[in-house]
Amino acid sequence: MPTVLITGGSRGIGAAMVRRFYAAGWNVAFSYWQSEQAAQALATQMPGVLSVRADVADSAQVAAMFSAVYAVFPHIDMLVNNAAVVQDGLFLDLTEADWQRVFAVNFFGAVYCTGEAIRDMYPRGRGNILNISSIWGLKGASCESGYASSKAALIGLSRSLAKEWGPSGIRVNCIAPGVIDTDMNAQHSAETMQALAEEIPLGRIGRAEEVASLALYLASPEAEYITGQVFSVDGGWNIT
């Protein structure tokens, strides 16, 4: 069976991907950082799923995480860089520490994980990397300059890696979700969520399972000729 490693897999879109890949018969490993209770509950529901605590912003912890995965599964066939933090605020209010943290997790975490994964994929001549960006990485957003910039950087990374590693059989793609019904958006009021839904051509908020379904498709043989692409899962919001 193929193996997938999903970072930030204990909640939201990450947890939906853990469930979807597990249901499709994959070996599944996922990382978490603060959500230990949620991670344990998720792993308990699916025998054989491996959960590993790691801060992806720390390259040493990333290396240890990959070692823990390889101790159970011989190879990683697909890496999903999903771990992320949100950093809201006016541009002039963001501190140096704010900028460093949002890029450390959202961008450099993906860099560290991708480096570890490619070292395993390259000798085998195949592999699949999926980066989870955001609609804000495509459109930008007021009071989201830190988060949006880090997610835009993921898009540039994905396209560059697709060109660099395509000749070695490694595919790299990106998903840019819109407003999805997850804990990350639970901070918004019902009125705010309704207002957002009204801006979306399909007229509703997205579901984490819809993002997970696309991730699984991009891992499938049917998607073997797809690389370097950014897929919006946003109900058409990106075209408004």
Residue ranges and their predicted role:
Residues 10-11:
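Conserved glycine-rich cofactor-binding loop
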Residues 24-40:
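Conserved glycine-rich Rossmann-like NAD(P)H-binding loop of the short-chain dehydrogenase/reductase
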Residues 90-91, 98-103, 185, 192, ...:
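Substrate-binding pocket helix/loop in short-chain dehydrogenase/reductase
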Residues 114, 150, 158:
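Active-site helix of classical SDR
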Residues 119, 163-167, 224:
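Alpha-helical segment proximal to the catalytic Tyr-Lys
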Residues 134:
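Residue(s) in the substrate-gating loop at a strand-loop-helix junction
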Residues 139, 216, 227-240:
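Short C-terminal tail/terminal secondary-structure segment
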